[in-house]
Amino acid sequence: SPFMQAIETLNRTVFLALNASPATPEWLIAAGVLIANYAILLVPVLLVSLWLAGGDERRALAVRACLVGLLALGINQVIGIAWYHPRPFAIGVGHTFLAHAPDSSFPSDHATLLSAISFTLLSAGKRRTGLLVLSVDIAVAWARVFIGVHWPFDMVGAVIVASLACMLGSTLWRFGGMTVTRALITVYRKALAMTIGERWLRP
C-alpha cells in the first residue's frame, strides 16, 4: 500500500542518516558494537540486585519486571513468525559492523526488553532506576541502528510491544503476582538457607 511504502521510505532514510560507514572513526564503531552487544547485561544484573536487596516490595518488582520482559519477548516471537521483515544487511542497505543472523528485524528484542524493564520500574515509582534503564535503552536503540543490524522502526515497534506487555503484565499481576513472589521467596530461602544463615545474603 502507498502508506506502507511511505513508512518504508522514511525508515530507510532515517536508517541511512544514522548508520555508520567505513569513514566513521573506529573508536565510535567499537563503542557502538560494545553497547549493541553488552548493554543488555544490565537487565539480569539489575533484577538480581533488586532481589538480593531484600524486602517483599523490591522482590515483587523484580519478579514483575521479569514477567513483563518475558511477555514482551514472547510477543516479539509471535510477530517475527507472523511477519518477516528483513534486516538492512539482508537486502544490501547501508553498512554492517556486527555479524548477525538474517532473522526478522521487527521489533528489536534488545530494545523491547530494556523498554519493558524501564516502563515497569517507572510505573512502580522507581524513577531514578527506571530512567537509568531508559537511557541505556536509548543508547542500545541508537547503537543497533548505527552498526547496521536494525532499522529505526524496529525500535518504534519495541516501544509499542513493551507498552502492550506492561498493560498485559499489570492485569496478570493482579491475578497472582504476589502469590508467585512469595513462593519464589520461600524457594530462595530454602535453597540458600546456609548462605542466608551465615548472613552473606538477606533473607
Regions found by a protein language model. Name each.
Residues 46-75:
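Interfacial segments of alpha-helical transmembrane regions
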Residues 25-27, 56-61, 125-131:
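Membrane-helix interface segments
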Residues 66-81, 130-143:
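Small-polar-interrupted transmembrane alpha-helices in polytopic inner-membrane proteins
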Residues 53-54, 83-85, 147-151:
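Short helix-capping/hinge motifs at transmembrane helix termini and TM-loop junctions
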Residues 1-42, 77-103, 184-203:
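N-terminal transmembrane-helix/juxtamembrane module of multi-pass inner/ER membrane proteins
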Residues 35-39, 65-66, 111, 128-132:
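Alpha-helical transmembrane segments
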Residues 98-203:
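Membrane-embedded catalytic cores of phosphoryl/pyrophosphoryl-handling enzymes
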Residues 46-49, 77, 119, 167:
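Transmembrane alpha-helix boundary and packing residues in multipass membrane permease domains
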